[in-house]
């Protein structure tokens, strides 16, 4: 599927990280989502009910990132991907990228980041029903 809905660099302040200082002080993270799904029905109908709202995607990412705490940004990304796949059946695959510009690394860098790609066959809900 070539069609995509993108949410790029949603800024959140949160307390994720392995170190106690990361939990205590918190830091900024940037979350990007790329959802692959068929956008033709929405394009033809001009009806938001025929697509996935990028506002809803951003709200899910923001809610999970600010109301839950994870030691690893990999776990944060998994939680976002699982929730989006469970909530929106139209999404075929989702890529979640977490940028951590203030990662506690003794080097000069723009950011550390992870990116995961998950699809329906990877989701926990699908696995449990097999």
Curated annotation (Swiss-Prot):
Enzyme Commission number(s) from the entry: 4.1.2.25
NCBIfam families: folB, folB_dom
GO cellular component, one term: cytoplasm
Name this polypeptide is given: Dihydroneopterin aldolase
Pathway, per record: Cofactor biosynthesis; tetrahydrofolate biosynthesis; 2-amino-4-hydroxy-6-hydroxymethyl-7,8-dihydropteridine diphosphate from 7,8-dihydroneopterin triphosphate: step 3/4
CDD domains documented for this protein: DHNA_DHNTPE (cd00534)
Family: Belongs to the DHNA family.
Keywords for the protein's UniProt record, in alphabetical order: Folate biosynthesis, Lyase
Encoding gene per record: folB
């Amino acid at each position: 599927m070539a069609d995509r809905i993108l949410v790029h660099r949603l800024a959140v302040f949160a307390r994720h990280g392995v170190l106690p200082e990361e939990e205590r002080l918190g830091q900024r993270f940037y979350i990007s989502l790329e959802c692959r799904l068929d956008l033709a029905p929405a394009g033809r109908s001009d009806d938001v009910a025929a697509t996935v709202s990028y506002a809803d995607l951003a709200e899910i990412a923001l809610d999970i990132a600010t109301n839950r705490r994870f030691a690893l940004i990999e776990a944060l990304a998994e939680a976002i991907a699982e929730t989006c796949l469970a909530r929106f059946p139209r999404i075929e695959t989702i890529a979640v990228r977490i940028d951590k510009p203030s990662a506690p690394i003794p080097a000069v860098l723009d950011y550390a980041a992870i990116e995961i790609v998950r699809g329906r066959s990877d989701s926990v809900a699908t696995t449990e029903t097999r």
